[in-house]
């Protein structure tokens, strides 16, 4: 097998990621992006959190978190609550509407996962995840 160029590798990864995201988000009943779903999921896990916590945990810039959270607030998926002791601090909490869209996303995500990744054996899937984590760890060093 001929060694692929860095451009071919990046293009291949990008095509897989983009196609996966489009197929997955197109199946949702509401128009919501994958980044918004990831942020919603993290807010749900934490119950309440500050924007800076989300940025650090998810590896997003502060401005990206601001843009995503503004969309989520407008869609009534999260609320922003000011800290009564320090007005500069705000906390996000997930709303009932946010829980509903996240539940739908999780159900569709599981179906998508079972469909797309069914072409891989359990061993191949474990290797794929291991390789992705290894590369991500190395890139972040």
Name these PLM-found stretches.
Residues 29-36, 95, 118-122:
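Short helix-coil-helix linker/hinge
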